[in-house]
UniProtKB/Swiss-Prot annotation:
Region called Interaction with substrate tRNA, residue ranges: 39-42
Pfam families tied to this protein: IPPT (PF01715)
Protein function: Catalyzes the transfer of a dimethylallyl group onto the adenine at position 37 in tRNAs that read codons beginning with uridine, leading to the formation of N6-(dimethylallyl)adenosine (i(6)A).
Keywords carried by this UniProt record: ATP-binding, Magnesium, Nucleotide-binding, Transferase, tRNA processing
Required cofactor(s): Mg(2+)
Marked site positions, Interaction with substrate tRNA: 105, 128
Family listed: Belongs to the IPP transferase family.
Assembly description: Monomer.
Record-listed E.C. numbers: 2.5.1.75
UniProt: ATP binding residues: 14-21
Top-level taxonomy: Bacteria, Bacillati, Bacillota, Bacilli, Bacillales
The protein's name in its UniProt record: tRNA dimethylallyltransferase
């Protein structure tokens, strides 16, 4: 018997504000594709402006998945993302379409593409109970700070009030000596799909200017009112509110910052995040990069995907 043919998947990654959304829709039109969001925050309903969620108009009739699937108060894990996205890949492929994953949440995308197993073994019960006791006696912030010291990446992703996940991350570090956020690295990294992995990049100053402009546009579009709606619903200590664009404006509503300072902090955090995204992708994944400083490279990228995945675009028929 011959080798089982792997499903073909195109993946578009890159920092925030680099132009992934438009490119993905152009590619989906040309390649008979459907889009899966690889963004850990666009899953939340009513959080549209701050997550730069693709609009119905931008979708232009192209089906999108993993958008608006959770309420802001719901928690969401990498394991659930992996399971859902792999199901979408199967279903899109069965319909004779090309799955296109687009987003900037590297760990989530990597968990889908590679043979990454999520373990939830018994761990160290005594240590876990010690941490639970500490959380009760000294507060959740104290335990979260301990996580920040050993695994800042996980601490950034997990809200202090999500005590179970904070302690789980601490427990993994305690028992293995490795960060939960680095677990992927010690597993066999075998690609499960026939993947074309495209990265968009541009001149740093230009990217930072685009990020600053995007934040200004978000404020014009009603980001303040969007966050106020969440705040008035009593949504406080949730995973979703840890997102850049929300935690900064929450500081304004909690009287911890002026609106001007909150917006300034949002710009700073967005620029830092873009820098971290680029570093992560360059260190962790084998990406073919396209520099879009001087404009779109849609035709060039389309030709590359056609060659890599042996698929034909509408343009080449």
């Amino acid at each position: 018997m011959g080798e089982v043919q792997r499903e073909k998947v195109a993946v578009i990654i890159g920092p925030t504000a680099v132009g992934k959304t438009k490119l993905s829709i152009d590619l989906a039109k040309a390649l008979n594709g459907e889009i899966i969001s690889g963004d850990s925050m666009q899953i939340y309903r009513t959080m549209d402006i701050g997550t730069a969620k693709v609009t119905q108009a931008e979708m232009d009739g192209i089906p999108h998945y993993m958008v608006d699937i959770k309420n802001p108060e719901d928690s969401f894990s990498v394991a659930e993302f992996q399971e859902r996205v792999r199901k979408h890949i199967r279903e899109i492929t069965e319909r004779g379409k090309l799955p296109i994953i687009v987003g900037g949440t590297g760990l989530y995308i990597q968990s889908v593409l590679f043979d990454y197993q999520f373990t939830d073994d018994a761990g160290d019960v005594i240590y876990r109970e010690q941490m639970e006791k500490l959380a009760l006696e000294r507060g959740v912030e104290y335990v979260h700070k301990k996580l920040q010291e050993v695994d800042p990446e996980s601490a950034e992703r997990i809200h202090a009030n999500n005590v179970r996940r904070v302690i789980r991350a601490l427990e993994i570090f305690h028992t293995t000596g490795e960060k939960m956020s680095d677990q992927i690295e010690k597993q066999e990294k075998e690609l499960l799909y026939d993947v074309s992995l495209i990265g968009l990049t541009m001149d740093r100053e230009m990217l930072y200017d685009r990020i600053n402009l995007r934040v200004d546009l978000m404020m014009e579009q009603g980001l303040l009112e969007e966050v106020e709606g969440l705040y008035n619903r009593g949504i406080r200590d949730c995973q979703s509110i840890q997102a850049i664009g929300y935690k900064e404006i929450y500081d304004y509503f909690e009287n911890r910052a002026s609106l001007e300072d909150a917006v300034s902090q949002l710009k700073t955090n967005s620029r830092r995040y873009a820098k971290r995204q680029l570093t992560w992708f360059r260190n962790k994944m084998d990406v073919t990069w396209f520099d879009v400083t001087d404009g779109e490279k849609t035709s060039e990228i389309l030709r590359y995907i056609e060659g890599k995945l042996q698929v034909k675009s509408n343009n080449s028929k």
